[in-house]
Protein backbone atom coordinates (compact mmCIF):
# COMPACT_ATOMS: atom_id res chain seq x y z
CA UNK A 1 0.00 0.00 0.00
CA UNK A 2 1.13 3.51 -0.78
CA UNK A 3 -0.21 6.86 0.38
CA UNK A 4 -1.64 9.18 -2.29
CA UNK A 5 0.65 11.86 -0.79
CA UNK A 6 3.56 9.87 -2.30
CA UNK A 7 2.19 9.95 -5.87
CA UNK A 8 4.68 10.68 -8.63
CA UNK A 9 4.37 10.68 -12.40
CA UNK A 10 4.74 7.17 -13.86
CA UNK A 11 3.69 5.37 -10.66
CA UNK A 12 1.41 2.36 -11.27
CA UNK A 13 -1.45 1.72 -8.86
CA UNK A 14 -4.37 -0.69 -8.55
CA UNK A 15 -7.73 0.99 -7.83
CA UNK A 16 -11.21 -0.55 -8.31
CA UNK A 17 -9.72 -3.75 -9.81
CA UNK A 18 -8.01 -1.78 -12.59
CA UNK A 19 -4.38 -0.88 -13.24
CA UNK A 20 -3.68 2.85 -13.51
CA UNK A 21 -0.56 4.84 -14.29
CA UNK A 22 -0.29 8.30 -12.74
CA UNK A 23 0.08 10.82 -15.57
CA UNK A 24 -0.29 13.98 -13.49
CA UNK A 25 -1.22 14.88 -9.92
CA UNK A 26 -1.72 17.93 -7.74
CA UNK A 27 -1.88 18.30 -3.96
CA UNK A 28 -4.69 20.73 -3.10
CA UNK A 29 -5.07 22.36 0.33
CA UNK A 30 -8.24 24.44 0.28
CA UNK A 31 -8.71 27.22 2.85
CA UNK A 32 -11.70 25.39 4.23
CA UNK A 33 -12.00 21.63 4.47
CA UNK A 34 -9.56 18.74 4.18
CA UNK A 35 -6.65 18.52 1.76
CA UNK A 36 -6.94 16.21 -1.24
CA UNK A 37 -4.96 14.94 -4.23
CA UNK A 38 -6.36 15.51 -7.72
CA UNK A 39 -4.87 13.03 -10.20
CA UNK A 40 -4.98 12.20 -13.89
CA UNK A 41 -4.74 8.42 -14.40
CA UNK A 42 -4.37 6.26 -17.52
CA UNK A 43 -5.86 2.75 -17.52
CA UNK A 44 -3.09 0.35 -18.61
CA UNK A 45 -5.53 -2.21 -20.03
CA UNK A 46 -7.83 0.07 -22.03
CA UNK A 47 -5.72 3.21 -22.48
CA UNK A 48 -8.54 5.47 -21.28
CA UNK A 49 -7.67 8.54 -19.22
CA UNK A 50 -9.65 9.49 -16.12
CA UNK A 51 -9.40 12.20 -13.48
CA UNK A 52 -9.77 10.93 -9.92
CA UNK A 53 -9.68 12.73 -6.58
CA UNK A 54 -8.34 11.10 -3.40
CA UNK A 55 -8.46 12.33 0.21
CA UNK A 56 -5.02 13.30 1.54
CA UNK A 57 -3.43 10.34 3.31
CA UNK A 58 -5.68 7.78 1.59
CA UNK A 59 -3.92 4.50 0.83
CA UNK A 60 -3.99 2.71 -2.54
CA UNK A 61 -2.38 -0.51 -3.68
CA UNK A 62 0.86 -0.15 -5.63
CA UNK A 63 0.99 -2.40 -8.70
CA UNK A 64 4.37 -3.93 -9.48
CA UNK A 65 4.81 -3.77 -13.25
CA UNK A 66 7.64 -5.83 -14.71
CA UNK A 67 9.44 -4.57 -17.80
CA UNK A 68 11.03 -7.33 -19.88
CA UNK A 69 13.51 -6.57 -22.67
CA UNK A 70 12.31 -8.26 -25.83
CA UNK A 71 12.99 -8.27 -29.53
CA UNK A 72 10.30 -7.85 -32.18
CA UNK A 73 10.70 -10.79 -34.56
CA UNK A 74 7.94 -10.77 -37.18
CA UNK A 75 4.25 -10.37 -38.01
CA UNK A 76 2.17 -13.49 -38.55
CA UNK A 77 -1.26 -12.56 -39.84
CA UNK A 78 -3.07 -10.61 -37.11
CA UNK A 79 -0.44 -11.39 -34.44
CA UNK A 80 3.08 -10.14 -33.82
CA UNK A 81 5.84 -12.26 -32.29
CA UNK A 82 8.30 -11.01 -29.66
CA UNK A 83 11.22 -12.93 -28.10
CA UNK A 84 12.60 -12.52 -24.58
CA UNK A 85 16.31 -11.63 -24.85
CA UNK A 86 17.27 -13.76 -21.82
CA UNK A 87 15.05 -16.86 -21.92
CA UNK A 88 14.38 -16.91 -25.71
CA UNK A 89 10.70 -17.46 -24.87
CA UNK A 90 8.38 -16.15 -27.60
CA UNK A 91 5.07 -14.39 -27.04
CA UNK A 92 2.41 -13.30 -29.51
CA UNK A 93 0.48 -10.05 -29.24
CA UNK A 94 -2.58 -9.19 -31.30
CA UNK A 95 -2.79 -6.06 -33.44
CA UNK A 96 -5.42 -4.64 -31.09
CA UNK A 97 -2.93 -4.77 -28.18
CA UNK A 98 -0.18 -2.84 -29.98
CA UNK A 99 -2.16 -0.80 -32.50
CA UNK A 100 -0.32 2.50 -31.91
CA UNK A 101 3.15 0.95 -31.62
CA UNK A 102 2.84 -0.94 -34.94
CA UNK A 103 3.70 2.22 -36.88
CA UNK A 104 7.17 2.24 -35.33
CA UNK A 105 8.04 -1.49 -35.12
CA UNK A 106 10.73 -2.98 -37.36
CA UNK A 107 11.94 -6.57 -37.35
CA UNK A 108 14.72 -7.29 -34.81
CA UNK A 109 13.98 -4.06 -32.92
CA UNK A 110 14.52 -4.06 -29.15
CA UNK A 111 11.48 -3.06 -27.05
CA UNK A 112 10.30 -3.33 -23.46
CA UNK A 113 7.17 -5.39 -22.74
CA UNK A 114 5.16 -4.33 -19.66
CA UNK A 115 3.66 -7.24 -17.71
CA UNK A 116 1.60 -7.52 -14.53
CA UNK A 117 1.29 -11.00 -12.99
CA UNK A 118 2.13 -12.60 -16.38
CA UNK A 119 -0.50 -10.48 -18.18
CA UNK A 120 0.97 -8.43 -21.04
CA UNK A 121 -0.13 -4.80 -20.75
CA UNK A 122 1.69 -3.28 -23.68
CA UNK A 123 4.87 -2.44 -25.54
CA UNK A 124 7.16 0.40 -24.52
CA UNK A 125 9.10 1.74 -27.49
CA UNK A 126 12.47 3.49 -27.40
CA UNK A 127 12.21 7.32 -27.44
CA UNK A 128 13.36 7.45 -31.06
CA UNK A 129 13.52 4.96 -33.95
CA UNK A 130 15.33 4.98 -37.29
CA UNK A 131 13.04 4.42 -40.27
CA UNK A 132 13.61 4.60 -44.03
CA UNK A 133 11.57 6.84 -46.33
CA UNK A 134 9.68 4.65 -48.82
CA UNK A 135 7.63 7.32 -50.62
CA UNK A 136 7.87 11.11 -50.87
CA UNK A 137 7.79 13.81 -53.49
CA UNK A 138 11.24 14.79 -54.80
CA UNK A 139 12.77 17.86 -53.16
CA UNK A 140 13.17 21.02 -55.21
CA UNK A 141 16.75 22.27 -55.27
CA UNK A 142 17.23 25.68 -53.71
CA UNK A 143 13.96 25.68 -51.74
CA UNK A 144 15.59 25.63 -48.30
CA UNK A 145 15.06 29.22 -47.14
CA UNK A 146 11.63 28.61 -45.66
CA UNK A 147 10.45 26.00 -43.18
CA UNK A 148 8.49 24.03 -45.80
CA UNK A 149 7.44 20.44 -45.08
CA UNK A 150 5.97 17.63 -47.13
CA UNK A 151 4.44 14.24 -46.24
CA UNK A 152 6.71 11.19 -46.37
CA UNK A 153 5.60 7.56 -46.06
CA UNK A 154 8.05 5.45 -44.05
CA UNK A 155 8.83 1.73 -44.34
CA UNK A 156 6.31 0.85 -41.61
CA UNK A 157 3.47 2.77 -43.27
CA UNK A 158 3.71 5.75 -40.91
CA UNK A 159 3.28 9.13 -42.63
CA UNK A 160 5.19 12.09 -41.14
CA UNK A 161 5.84 15.67 -42.18
CA UNK A 162 9.50 16.10 -43.19
CA UNK A 163 11.58 19.01 -44.52
CA UNK A 164 11.47 19.46 -48.30
CA UNK A 165 15.10 18.29 -48.78
CA UNK A 166 14.37 14.70 -47.61
CA UNK A 167 14.36 12.11 -50.44
CA UNK A 168 13.26 8.48 -50.83
CA UNK A 169 15.65 5.91 -49.33
CA UNK A 170 16.96 8.21 -46.59
CA UNK A 171 17.06 7.04 -42.96
CA UNK A 172 15.27 9.35 -40.52
CA UNK A 173 15.10 9.55 -36.74
CA UNK A 174 11.45 9.64 -35.60
CA UNK A 175 10.20 10.55 -32.10
CA UNK A 176 7.91 7.67 -31.03
CA UNK A 177 6.04 9.70 -28.41
CA UNK A 178 4.84 12.34 -30.87
CA UNK A 179 5.30 10.47 -34.16
CA UNK A 180 7.29 13.36 -35.60
CA UNK A 181 10.48 13.79 -37.63
CA UNK A 182 13.57 14.62 -35.53
CA UNK A 183 16.51 14.53 -37.97
CA UNK A 184 18.36 12.48 -40.55
CA UNK A 185 20.03 9.35 -39.21
UniProtKB/Swiss-Prot annotation:
Pfam families: EFP, EFP_N, Elong-fact-P_C. Keywords: Cytoplasm, Elongation factor, Protein biosynthesis. GO terms for cellular component: cytoplasm. Signal peptide: none annotated. Belongs to the elongation factor P family. Involved in peptide bond synthesis. Stimulates efficient translation and peptide-bond synthesis on native or reconstituted 70S ribosomes in vitro. Probably functions indirectly by altering the affinity of the ribosome for aminoacyl-tRNA, thus increasing their reactivity as acceptors for peptidyl transferase. HAMAP family: EF_P. This is Elongation factor P.
